[in-house]
C-alpha cells in the first residue's frame, strides 16, 4: 500500500502527453497531424484507463485500510517564507478519481464518433484531456494554493469547451458569461484563502483544521472574521456548482458540444464545487452559521432548478436545470452535515446524468440529419416526438436514466436521494417537505422530456424548411430566425403540444381542443422528403432519425449498467455478520452530524417510510406529466380524462392564468437573468460609457486644450516677432501697459 501511495503524484500527469503532443504536432506538422487525427483518441483513452486502474487500486486499499496519506515537498525561499506542494490520498480523493476517470473514458469513447465530422476534432480532444488532468490535479491537491491553481485550470478548460464553436456568437457569449460569473466566485475563494492564511499561517489540510479548532477552543480568533472567511471560501463553490444566485451560467454552457456537457455535469466542473465543500467540511462544521447557510442555499437551488426546468424547449437546458437542482440536494446534505449522503448522491447522479446527456447527444446527432446543425432546431423538443421506433436503444437507455433521476427504486439515484430526504426530516421538517415535493417536480419535468421526445409523432414532419407556405403547420428557416406561425387547421390535437407563445414559446400544458378523431392526413404522414440535386439530377430522399454508431452506443450501454448497479455500494445491509455497506467502509472516517450515536445509522423502517412518501410524490409527478404530455390519441381513456378535466374545471380563466404565470416564470428563467441585465449589466455599461465620456471629454480635454491654446498663441506671436524693430517696440509697450493695469488694480485699493 505504501508503495502504491508513493507514486500517486503521477496520477494527474499520466494523460498529459496527449494534449502536449497534439499541440506540438499542430504547430510543427499540421498537415500530418490533421490527416492522422482519429488516432489521437486511442492514446487519450489508454492513458486515462491507466489512471483509472491506478485509482481503482487506491480505492481498494482505501476500503480495506481506511488510510490517510499525504506527502509534501517544501521549497524554502527564506527564513520567513516557504512554498509547499504535494498530494493527498484519502477516501474523498479515491472516490473522485474513480468518478473522473470512468466518466472521462466513456465520454472520450463517445466523442470519437460524435466529433468525427468536426474540424476541431484534435482541439476538442486536447481540451477534454486537459480537463480531466486539471480535475485529477484538483482532487489530489494537499493544500488550498494547489487547489486554487487547478481550480482555475478546470475553469479555463470549461470556458474553452463551452465556447468550442466560437464562430457562433451565442457560444462565444455563453463562454464569456460563464467566465464572468465564475470570476465572482473565484475572487471570493481567493480572498478566503488569503484570509485563512492570515489567521492560521498555513494552508495545508494536515495542519489547517487542527489549528482552527485550537484557536476556537482557546478563544484566540475572531469568530465573525472566521465566518466571513468561510463564507468567501463557500462563494467559490456557489459559482462552480451553479448554486443560487450564481447559477445563471449553467444553462448557457449547453452551447458547447454535448460530450463536454456530460463531463461538466457529471464529474468535473460542477462536481468541483461539491468537492471543495466536502474537503473543507471540518472547517465549516465549527461554524453553525455557515452550515445553515450552505443548507439554505442548497434548498433554494433545489426548488429553483426544478421550477426553471418545467418549461424549457431545449433538451440540454432542461437537463442543465436538472443538474442544478440535484447539486442543490448535495449542497443541502453537506449543510446538514450528512457527508456520506452527499457523496453518495454525487456518485449516483454523475452516472445517471452522464447517461442522460450522452443519450440526448445521440438524439441530437440523429435529428441533425433532418433539421440541420442549428442547436435551436436539433435540440428543440418541439421538433421531436415519436423517436421510440427510430432509436429504440437510446430510448431505453434514456428511460433508465430518467427513472434513476426521478428516484424510482431500485435505480441508483433512489438510494442516494432518499437518504438525503431521510436525513432532512431530522434536520428540518420544512426543508424535508420542500425537498420531497421537489422530488415529485423532478419526476414531472423528466417525464415531460421523455414524453415530448419519444412519444407521439415525429413533429418535424409537420415543418417546411424551404420557407414557402404549404400544408404544414409551421414554417421555419433552416439557419435564420425562427418563423413560427400557429395555424389551427381541422382542429388537430397535435397543436395541443405545440402551442406557441410570443411566436417562440411552447406551453407545458395541453390546451383547448381534444378531438375524438385523428385527421387521416396526420396518420398518413410517414416520412419527410427533401429534394436533392446531384449534378443536375433531381432525387428525393426520405430521412428518418437513425440510431447512433456502435462507439456511441457502447458508452451509453456501459452507463446504463452503472446506473442500474452503482446504487448498491451505499445500501446498508449485512449477511451472516458480513457488512456489505461498501461506501461506509470507503469513507471511514467520515463526518455525520445527524447520526452521531449510531453505528448503523440507517433506520430501515424510518427510511422505507420516508421513501414511500417520496416515491408516491414521484409517481404523482409522472402521472401529471403523462396527463399533460402523453399523446391523446394513444389512449382513449386519457382522451376522455382530458375532456372531463376541460369540462369540469371550476374556473378556467383562473387555471389558465395560473399556468401562464408558472410557464412565464420557468421559460424566462425566473427573471433572474433579466434582473441581472437591468441591475448590473446595464448599470455597469452606463458607468463605463460615462467614464469613457469623462476621460475623453474632460480629463483629456485639459491637456489637449492647453496644447491647442499654446499652438495658437505661438502662431500669433510668430507673426509679431518677425525681425522688425517696430514690432518689438509695439510688443514691449503692450507688456508695459498690461503690467501697469495689473499694478493699478492690485495696489490702488490698499
Curated annotation (Swiss-Prot):
Keyword terms, alphabetized = Chloroplast, Membrane, NAD, NADP, Plastid, Plastoquinone, Quinone, Thylakoid, Translocase, Transmembrane, Transmembrane helix, Transport
**Statement: the UniProt record of this protein carries the keyword Transmembrane helix:** yes
Class of this enzyme? translocase
Residues spanning the membrane = 9-29, 40-60, 89-109, 125-145, 147-167, 185-205, 219-239, 258-278, 280-300, 327-347, 354-374, 396-416, 425-445, 554-574, 607-627, 728-748
Quote the subcellular location field of this record. Plastid, Chloroplast thylakoid membrane
InterPro entries noted in UniProt = NADH_UbQ_OxRdtase_chlpt_su5_C, NADHpl_OxRdtase_5_subgr, ND/Mrp_TM, NU5C-like, Proton_antipo_N
EC number(s) reported in the record: 7.1.1.-
Q: What catalytic activity is recorded?
A: a plastoquinone + NADH + (n+1) H(+)(in) = a plastoquinol + NAD(+) + n H(+)(out); a plastoquinone + NADPH + (n+1) H(+)(in) = a plastoquinol + NADP(+) + n H(+)(out)
Mode of membrane association? Multi-pass membrane protein
- Which terms in the Gene Ontology molecular function aspect does this entry carry? NADH dehydrogenase (ubiquinone) activity; quinone binding
This protein's source sits in the domain of life called Eukaryota
Tell me the GO BP annotations in alphabetical order. Answer: ATP synthesis coupled electron transport; electron transport coupled proton transport
Subunit architecture: NDH is composed of at least 16 different subunits, 5 of which are encoded in the nucleus.
The family line of this record is:
Belongs to the complex I subunit 5 family.
Q: What does this protein do?
A: NDH shuttles electrons from NAD(P)H:plastoquinone, via FMN and iron-sulfur (Fe-S) centers, to quinones in the photosynthetic chain and possibly in a chloroplast respiratory chain. The immediate electron acceptor for the enzyme in this species is believed to be plastoquinone. Couples the redox reaction to proton translocation, and thus conserves the redox energy in a proton gradient.
Record's protein name? NAD(P)H-quinone oxidoreductase subunit 5, chloroplastic
- Organism of provenance: Glycine max (Soybean)
The gene it comes from is ndhF
Amino acid at each position: 500500500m505504501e508503495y502504491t501511495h508513493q507514486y500517486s503524484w503521477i496520477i494527474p500527469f499520466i494523460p498529459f502527453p496527449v494534449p502536449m503532443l497534439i499541440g506540438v504536432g499542430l504547430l510543427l506538422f499540421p498537415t500530418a497531424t490533421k490527416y492522422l487525427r482519429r488516432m489521437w483518441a486511442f492514446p487519450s483513452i489508454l492513458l486515462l484507463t491507466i489512471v483509472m486502474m491506478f485509482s481503482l487500486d487506491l480505492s481498494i486499499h482505501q476500503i480495506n485500510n481506511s488510510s490517510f496519506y499525504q506527502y509534501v515537498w517544501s521549497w524554502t525561499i527564506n527564513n520567513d517564507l516557504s512554498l509547499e506542494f504535494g498530494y493527498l490520498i484519502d477516501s474523498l480523493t479515491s472516490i473522485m478519481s474513480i468518478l473522473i476517470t470512468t466518466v472521462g473514458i466513456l465520454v472520450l469513447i463517445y466523442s470519437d464518433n460524435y466529433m468525427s465530422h468536426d474540424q476541431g476534432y484534435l482541439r476538442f480532444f486536447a481540451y477534454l484531456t486537459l480537463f480531466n488532468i486539471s480535475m485529477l490535479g484538483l482532487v489530489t491537491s494537499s493544500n488550498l494554493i494547489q487547489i486554487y491553481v487547478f481550480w482555475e485550470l478546470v475553469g479555463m478548460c470549461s470556458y474553452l469547451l463551452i465556447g468550442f464553436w466560437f464562430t457562433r456568437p451565442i457560444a462565444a457569449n455563453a463562454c464569456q458569461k460563464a467566465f464572468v460569473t465564475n470570476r465572482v466566485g473565484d475572487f471570493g475563494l481567493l480572498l478566503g484563502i488569503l484570509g485563512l492564511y492570515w489567521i492560521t499561517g498555513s494552508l495545508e489540510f494536515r495542519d489547517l483544521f487542527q489549528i482552527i479548532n485550537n484557536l476556537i477552543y482557546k478563544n484566540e480568533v475572531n469568530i465573525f472574521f472566521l465566518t466571513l472567511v468561510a463564507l468567501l471560501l463557500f462563494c467559490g463553490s456557489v459559482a462552480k456548482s451553479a448554486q443560487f444566485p450564481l447559477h445563471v451560467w449553467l444553462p448557457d454552457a449547453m452551447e458547447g458540444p454535448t460530450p463536454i456537457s456530460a463531463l461538466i455535469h457529471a464529474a468535473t466542473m460542477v462536481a468541483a464545487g461539491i468537492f471543495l465543500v466536502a474537503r473543507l467540511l471540518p472547517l465549516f462544521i465549527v461554524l453553525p452559521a455557515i452550515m445553515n447557510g450552505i443548507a439554505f442555499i442548497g434548498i433554494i437551488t433545489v426548488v429553483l432548478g426544478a421550477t426553471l426546468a418545467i418549461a424549457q424547449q431545449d433538451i440540454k437546458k432542461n437537463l442543465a436545470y436538472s443538474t442544478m437542482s440535484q447539486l442543490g440536494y448535495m449542497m443541502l446534505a453537506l449543510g446538514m452535515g450528512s457527508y456520506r449522503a452527499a457523496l453518495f448522491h454525487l456518485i449516483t447522479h454523475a452516472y445517471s446524468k452522464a447517461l442522460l446527456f450522452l443519450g440526448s447527444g445521440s438524439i441530437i446527432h440523429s435529428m441533425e440529419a433532418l433539421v440541420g446543425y442549428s442547436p435551436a432546431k436539433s435540440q428543440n423538443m418541439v421538433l421531436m416526438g415519436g423517436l421510440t421506433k427510430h432509436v429504440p436503444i437510446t430510448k431505453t437507455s434514456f428511460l433508465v436514466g430518467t427513472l434513476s433521476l426521478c428516484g424510482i427504486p431500485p435505480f441508483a439515484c433512489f438510494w442516494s436521494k432518499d437518504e438525503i430526504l431521510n436525513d432532512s426530516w431530522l434536520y428540518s421538517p420544512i426543508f424535508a417537505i420542500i425537498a420531497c415535493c421537489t422530488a415529485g417536480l423532478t419526476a414531472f419535468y423528466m417525464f415531460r422530456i421523455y414524453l415530448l421526445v419519444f412519444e407521439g409523432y415525429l413533429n418535424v414532419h409537420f415543418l417546411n424548411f424551404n420557407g414557402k407556405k404549404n400544408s404544414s403547420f409551421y414554417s421555419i428557416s433552416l439557419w435564420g430566425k425562427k418563423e413560427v406561425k400557429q395555424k389551427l387547421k381541422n382542429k388537430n390535437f397535435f397543436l395541443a403540444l405545440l402551442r406557441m407563445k410570443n411566436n417562440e414559446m411552447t406551453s407545458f400544458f395541453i390546451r383547448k381542443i381534444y378531438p375524438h378523431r385523428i385527421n387521416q392526413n396526420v396518420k398518413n404522414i410517414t416520412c419527410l422528403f427533401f429534394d436533392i440535386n446531384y449534378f443536375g439530377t433531381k432525387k428525393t430522399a426520405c430521412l428518418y432519425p437513425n440510431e447512433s454508431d456502435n462507439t456511441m452506443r457502447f458508452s451509453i450501454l456501459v452507463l446504463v449498467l452503472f446506473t442500474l448497479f452503482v446504487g448498491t455500494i451505499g445500501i446498508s445491509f449485512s449477511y451472516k455478520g458480513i457488512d456489505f455497506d461498501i461506501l461506509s467502509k470507503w469513507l471511514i472516517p467520515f463526518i455525520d452530524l445527524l447520526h452521531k450515536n449510531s453505528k448503523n445509522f440507517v433506520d430501515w423502517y424510518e427510511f422505507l417510510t420516508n421513501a414511500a412518501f417520496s416515491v408516491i410524490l414521484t409517481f404523482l409527478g409522472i402521472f401529471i406529466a403523462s396527463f399533460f404530455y402523453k399523446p391523446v390519441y394513444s389512449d382513449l381513456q386519457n382522451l376522455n380524462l382530458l375532456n372531463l378535466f376541460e369540462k369540469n374545471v371550476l374556473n378556467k380563466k383562473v387555471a389558465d392564468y395560473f399556468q401562464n404565470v408558472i410557464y412565464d416564470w420557468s421559460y424566462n428563467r425566473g427573471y433572474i437573468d433579466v434582473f441581472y441585465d437591468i441591475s448590473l449589466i446595464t448599470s455597469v455599461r452606463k458607468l463605463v460609457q460615462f467614464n469613457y465620456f469623462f476621460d475623453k471629454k474632460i480629463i483629456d480635454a485639459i491637456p489637449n486644450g492647453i496644447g491647442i491654446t499654446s499652438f495658437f498663441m505661438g502662431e500669433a506671436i510668430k507673426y509679431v516677432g518677425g525681425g522688425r524693430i517696430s514690432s518689438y517696440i509695439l510688443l514691449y509697450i503692450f507688456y508695459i501697459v498690461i503690467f501697469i493695469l495689473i499694478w493699478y488694480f492690485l495696489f490702488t485699493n490698499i
